[in-house]
Amino acid sequence: MENAIRNAFTMKVKSGFETEYKIRHDQIWPELTALLSESGICDYSIFLDEETGILFGVQKLSSGFDRSQLSSHPLMRKWWNHMSDIMETNPDNSPKTNSLKEVFHLD
């Protein structure tokens, strides 16, 4: 993806649910991965700090990526509901996220 924007953020899995978080992502719905790709997300990884439960997400976004459009999609909301019992979430069940500032990059 040319002119991709790197995006990094943190989330938090509830204590004791780290394995379940991994299982659910191992079984991610194919239609959700298609939606993420079609929305302009690629090269997406999530890492877990096992001591703190902090999740570190990093992804590349197309220049035309529209977060509000993805956030309002019924399938995205269904996934959030599916994950809400094991993550720290906002009132709409979206995961609580903390955007990170890039301070170094090497191609």
From Swiss-Prot:
It is an enzyme of class 5 (isomerase). Residues 88-107 are annotated as: Disordered. The keyword Transmembrane helix does not apply. The keyword Iron-sulfur does not apply. The active site is at 25 (proton donor). Gene3D superfamilies: 3.30.70.100. GO terms for molecular function: L-rhamnose mutarotase activity. InterPro entries: Dimeric_a/b-barrel (IPR011008), L-rhamnose_mutarotase (IPR013448), Rham/fucose_mutarotase (IPR008000). GO terms for biological process: rhamnose catabolic process. It catalyses: alpha-L-rhamnose = beta-L-rhamnose. It is found in: Cytoplasm. Pathway: Carbohydrate metabolism; L-rhamnose metabolism. Residues 90-100 have a biased composition (Polar residues). Its EC number is 5.1.3.32. Substrate binds at residues 21, 44, 79-80. Keywords: Carbohydrate metabolism, Cytoplasm, Isomerase, Rhamnose metabolism. GO terms for cellular component: cytoplasm. NCBIfam families: YiiL_rotase. Belongs to the rhamnose mutarotase family. Involved in the anomeric conversion of L-rhamnose. Homodimer. This is L-rhamnose mutarotase. It comes from Flavobacterium johnsoniae (strain ATCC 17061 / DSM 2064 / JCM 8514 / BCRC 14874 / CCUG 350202 / NBRC 14942 / NCIMB 11054 / UW101).
